[in-house]
């Protein structure tokens, strides 16, 4: 599993180098692309190049909406899926509702519920969600299970102030087993 964050593609040079490198990854490598809040700063050519190779594109609702507007402005009617392979998946983070997974272009959207917890701070929650999802994939889980892990990690991340510390594997597994989120600082 290789993760490329759009925040690393905000300069023309970095966008070109990173998107072309990622596009050249061998097929046995799972490429996860995260859209990031810097979506408008990424050159369109980089999106076109990297989406054509991506296995999973993950984004927040705001990032998805912003990117959709950029792509449509460039090519009337274009969507994120226009640039992706039909067999690639999308994961959209929808805040307190968890995330939505579409495993391939014509697949139904699967809602993966969040774990309920009082929200102390949302700093770093997107990064935690992406990292937990990638960890699940590395551990050999299917994407739906990896997204459930990501939701558990995200719930732990928002349970305390600050983006640090990030949840441990044991803490995530405890949430998955019990459904209960506890403040990881206690």
Predicted features along the sequence, with ranges:
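Conserved beta-alpha-beta core of the PfkB/ribokinase-like small-molecule kinase fold
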Residues: 1-78, 97-98
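Conserved phosphate-binding/catalytic region of the ribokinase-like
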Residues: 24, 70-186
